[in-house]
């Protein structure tokens, strides 16, 4: 064994050793030893140091086990945040001759985990009595992993991990189009939750439509993420929107038309706005289109205030059979849908032309000029002429357009 390997092995072996160890005249670190400065507690299996109890730092589920100061078991993880357990050598024994494995290891580790869980629970009960509610719920991840969420049942503050806010237009695929939900920035009190209202939604937007999400977004409701104990007080406040009948009615609907893109084919209903009813509550939306879902009307409602193609992000994820996002198809369908909306909502042909024309800021030669544009029966330019038309110009430009 090379000197470097010897040194690294010794450093690992002496971390929990009960007496100082010198190697090459250097004192080796014993940070996991009983006299290494950590705060240990006595238990039925030995002494335990609980890591991560001073301030929240994740679930804290990894641990190292020592017997007579030597490492004898470690849970599988690369994290350095670990609980330390020194087993009572009168009750537990190592297998000879190497003494690097426990006798009846599986049974011993099962008991170690049980006692570790009990010790963590006892510590949290003590902390609950001394910490503020906001500080205590900061340990949510660790409480959840150790199945101790019941300790939050009577705490008048909800951890942000249990709630979501709708911050953007709801879409059917958040991996492709981005998240429209996020955690609140801080824990929320009972009063804050009651003021805003909290709901649960169990809809797949592509299948069930975006109606309930748009309703909740319009009302600025909080979304319950369903992660607290069944006995938590928040369950008495959560309004389950899927338990209520969803009705969407248009306001001053003008007409319907069929959109035929490369990916999306769908009936589109044009209107001034639409109302979303859930129970006796209603919201009216005039600036966000809504897809009603494949299991419902399977159509799109476009109010007057939305001239975008964002609603296609509710209808389709534009993923191929190989789960790859088809960006070019998405962009072409989006451009086509915008033109489709303009064609169906423009007040007159000139208004439609103005809304459909691109930006010519990169062509200084066109600045201040006027043109006569003729479209063919498919809506494509048949001829473009400078205005006023000069003699012979029509034939020249028309020939150019056809070449």
Model-identified regions with their sequence ranges:
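Short, conserved catalytic or adaptor-binding loops enriched in Gly and charged residues
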Residues: 13
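GHKL/Histidine-kinase-like ATPase module
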Residues: 4-7, 16-120, 152-194, 203-204, ...
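Phosphate/anion-contacting hairpin/loop surfaces
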Residues: 10
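Charge-rich (often acidic), low-complexity intrinsically disordered regions concentrated
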Residues: 41, 144-403
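Hydrophobic alpha-helical interaction segments
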Residues: 112-154
């Amino acid at each position: 064994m090379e000197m470097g390997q010897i040194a690294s092995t010794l450093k690992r072996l002496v971390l929990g050793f009960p007496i100082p160890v010198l190697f090459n005249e250097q004192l080796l670190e014993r940070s996991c030893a009983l006299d290494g400065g950590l705060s240990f507690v006595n238990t039925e299996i030995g002494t335990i140091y609980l890591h991560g109890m001073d301030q929240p730092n994740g679930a804290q589920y990894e641990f190292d086990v020592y017997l007579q100061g030597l490492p004898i078991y470690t849970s599988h993880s690369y994290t350095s945040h670990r609980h330390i357990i020194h087993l009572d050598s009168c009750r537990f024994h190592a297998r000879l001759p190497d003494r690097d494995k426990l006798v009846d290891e599986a049974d011993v580790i099962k008991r170690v985990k049980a006692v570790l869980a009990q010790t963590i629970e006892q510590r949290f009960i003590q902390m609950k009595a001394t910490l503020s509610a906001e500080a205590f719920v900061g340990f949510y991840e660790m409480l959840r992993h150790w199945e101790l969420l019941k300790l939050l049942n009577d705490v008048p503050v909800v951890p942000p991990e249990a709630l979501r806010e709708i911050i953007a237009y709801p879409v059917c695929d958040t991996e492709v189009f981005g998240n429209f939900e996020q955690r609140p920035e801080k824990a929320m009190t009972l009063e804050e939750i009651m003021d805003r209202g909290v709901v649960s939604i169990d809809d797949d937007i592509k299948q069930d439509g975006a109606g309930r999400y748009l309703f909740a977004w319009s009302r600025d409701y909080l979304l319950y993420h369903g992660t607290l104990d069944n006995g938590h007080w928040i369950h008495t406040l959560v309004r389950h929107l899927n338990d209520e009948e969803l009705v969407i009615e248009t306001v001053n609907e003008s007409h319907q038309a069929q959109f035929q893109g490369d990916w999306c084919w769908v009936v589109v209903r044009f209107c001034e706005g639409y109302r979303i009813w859930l129970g006796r509550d209603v919201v009216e939306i005039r600036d966000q289109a809504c897809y009603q879902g494949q299991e419902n009307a399977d159509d799109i409602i476009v109010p007057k205030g939305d001239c975008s193609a964002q609603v296609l992000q509710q209808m389709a994820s534009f993923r191929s059979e190989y789960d790859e996002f088809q960006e070019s198809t998405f962009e072409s369908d989006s451009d086509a849908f915008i033109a489709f909306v303009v064609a169906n909502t423009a007040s007159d042909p000139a208004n439609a032309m103005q809304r459909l024309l691109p930006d010519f800021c990169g062509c200084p030669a066109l600045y201040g000029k006027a043109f006569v544009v003729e479209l063919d029966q498919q809506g494509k330019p048949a001829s473009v002429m400078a205005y006023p038309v000069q003699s012979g110009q029509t034939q020249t430009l028309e020939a150019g357009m056809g070449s």
